[in-house]
Amino acid sequence: MIKFDNKLEIRYSFNDKSAYMDAWIKHRCEKEILSMLRVLADLLDVKMTAHCEPFSQEGGYRVVWPIAGESTRSISVVLNILMQVLTRPTLSVGGQPLVDRTNSDEENMQKEISLLKRSLKLKQAGALIPRELVELLASWPKFCKYKSNFYEALRGYPKVTKINVRELNENNRSRSGSLEVKREQFDYFILRSDDLPTIKDNKATIEIISPVLKDSRYRWKGIYNKGGETIDFYMCDEDFKKQMFDEKISFTSGMCIDCVLEIARKLSELGETINISYTVTTVIRTRFDKLEIVTPQGKRHLRKLEAEKKQLTLDLFG
């Protein structure tokens, strides 16, 4: 007999007194929440399985998922993070992201996850869920997409007026406060676009496989040093292309460029980040074997970076 010390409850409130719900909407919503639950459990290395429990209710619709696993406390932590992330808006009133995600946010999130995971493994009593971790997870693109899919499905189903989530114990008594999101707030969770901010790699190195000098519509091919993957990229450094066309720089097999690389990204339906295009804006230097040549535009770029660094130092200590 499986013991269920933890349960997750989702209540859908309706604009009428019925107790039925569109099956397609219900299953689409459940898919997004279960996906978030699985990702959180994997991130924190918590072994758990979710089950379905029948529950009757007059007016509205109630879903209860009994959760089984090795640690009641760890499961409770996962459920509480899930509830906070699910009910924390992604966008402002104007439709802009509440948080501008940066690379340091990704690093901090992984650091906070590691600390909480360690705390759970050591079974430290009274370990709190860091607020910073909840905020970082709530703005994580993967979870933003899950939330967007969830609330977009409900927005298209006018019958639902609000949702509530809470954790229950084995006797279906509340283990946590109930968190609520009303219909008029749904838009604050729905992404306006799947496009993500372009990231800039100022220290990219690409081994050129095949250049294209005559037609800017075609992409170059090279091996990107981050992960060693082969990429197709646009060369938008016109000075560099002219230098190669005029044979001031000659292409040789094995030639590498250190450059500024812009990477355009978007979210997939599953919340995965996909790189959709690569663009080299500035070639800083060329390298072949032990020979390195800094380009004129590369010198200008390096001087600009140095000036910005000095200005930042003055601002900090001035």
Where are these predicted regions, by residue range?
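Structural detector for short beta-strands of small beta-barrel domains
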Residues: I199-S216, W220
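Extended, charge-rich, solvent-exposed interface segments
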Residues: F288-G318
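Short, acidic/hydrophobic/Gly-rich beta-strand patch recurrent on exposed beta strands
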Residues: K221-K226
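OB-fold/S1-family single-stranded nucleic acid-binding modules
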Residues: A264-K299
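Charged, alpha-helical interface segments at or near domain boundaries
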Residues: M1-D201, P211
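Beta-strand/loop nucleic-acid-binding surfaces
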Residues: G228-S250
